[in-house]
Amino acid sequence: MSRRLIYVLNINRKSTHKIQENEIYTYFSHCNIDHTSTELDFVVKNYDLNRRQHVTGYTALHCYLYNNYFTNDVLKILLNHDVNVTMKTSSGRMPVYILLTRCCNISHDVVIDMIDKDKNHLSHRDYSNLLLEYIKSRYMLLKEEDIDENIVSTLLDKGIDPNFKQDGYTALHYYYLCLAHVYKPGECRKPITIKKAKRIISLFIQHGANLNALDNCGNTPFHLYLSIEMCNNIHMTKMLLTFNPNFKICNNHGLTPILCYITSDYIQHDILVMLIHHYETNVGEMPIDERRMIVFEFIKTYSTRPADSITYLMNRFKNINIYTRYEGKTLLHVACEYNNTQVIDYLIRINGDINALTDNNKHATQLIIDNKENSPYTINCLLYILRYIVDKNVIRSLVDQLPSLPIFDIKSFEKFISYCILLDDTFYDRHVKNRDSKTYRYAFSKYMSFDKYDGIITKCHDETMLLKLSTVLDTTLYAVLRCHNSRKLRRYLTELKKYNNDKSFKIYSNIMNERYLNVYYKDMYVSKVYDKLFPVFTDKNCLLTLLPSEIIYEILYMLTINDLYNISYPPTKV
């Protein structure tokens, strides 16, 4: 049911009576007009529809095109009563411009009718930005409105230049932005089918559009498409690649299309693989600098499958390895700095050195602390890499910075302190010594009260003393948890499993479980590899037969779990 008219014309007056200008303005600008109504019939017969308002320069046609209740049927009636479609408003807007950039649910027929009534060819400079503004309006204002393929075709056929630029953008720049934002969460845009998008882009190309035109920032349309965060429609991206966009063009920031995608804050693994494959298939080998930048920038970015992506990149780019540095940092440094735990895990598994320093002598732990943007995850990331750190000086440095560490999760902070007390046997004594110092107590006031902090340390220390009293064969549970040598820990595997279920340890139970699982899987894969290579070890023609089995086991234990797994289950080559 339509809304009641907010203004009703008096149609019972004599035809000789003059209709007031403000009445017409109100009627065409704000009323929900029925194309069959007697009011509309009365107006078009008794009023000069081409009369302009003094200030705005609007005619009846302009007013109606700005009406929120616009319909194609009413517009057709106005066009049939000889409205002037070439008159501009005071701001220079022509009716066809308003129609294409302001109105919803436009009929292709009325667009043709309006264009045909204008004797000027659309190549005239007054219409040069018409196609661009039509698509731009669908990108910026009328987000739920579709881009009509027939309208695009008509505008191009009528002579509009598809390469016209406004603020550096062409119509294709805006169209690619529309395609990217359709799939961005929260945008509420009308879906664009891949087939339709392909037809529209083909129309542009057929009419001479430059697919690699640059905006003021040096971006091609494909740059813009890939730079939109959460643009993750693999099928749309695959379709755009069929037009062979130029992958070598760098924008003003030195970024190629692939690097634009890598730095977009959201990476979909399958799209990343597709882009690199397309580049190497159609362009050739990627420059070493770009390969290095892709890997390092990827680590900084959120991705759907980080472990799969970093594995793919490291295998694909053979000259990028755990020792490669970029801006003075290794891959592992960057992974720690940006809290990418899955990448950290992978790089350590392939023998990345967690204790290596940057070119300006910073440890990975310091990079984590210095990155304030990731402060909510600082404790968790430090906690994650502590299992790999054996350098006592690094642990001591971490302990000294405890007052400045941001605390967002008490449980994580408690676990972090438990690690520090376990690995630094001077921590508790130094804490007790400084407990009464006002300066020391004040340093902890930023995130929690000193009493609460002191309580956590005391609780962890008490449980540490319990670890020292718990015997495991010829040593203590405390010594076992401090040990990082899987070969030595193997003999304590059964005892660790028993203590793992001991409810006396509330704080250190997680660390026990980590140690147990690490030793368990290491031992399992060493046994698998030994069994698999046994025919080699026992072959009389092999020099390895000269080595005692104990030495062979020692060598196998030097390998990472990842190395052992790959020997046990070699990756299949596609």
UniProtKB/Swiss-Prot annotation:
It comes from the Viruses. PROSITE patterns: ANK_REP_REGION, ANK_REPEAT, FBOX. Residues 541-574 form the F-box domain. It holds the Pfam family PRANC. ANK repeats lie at residues 56-87, 135-164, 167-213, 217-249, 253-285, 327-356. InterPro entries: Ank_repeat_dom-contain_49 (IPR051637), Ankyrin_rpt (IPR002110), Ankyrin_rpt-contain_sf (IPR036770), F-box_dom (IPR001810), PRANC_domain (IPR018272). This is Ankyrin repeat protein B18. It comes from Vaccinia virus (strain Copenhagen).
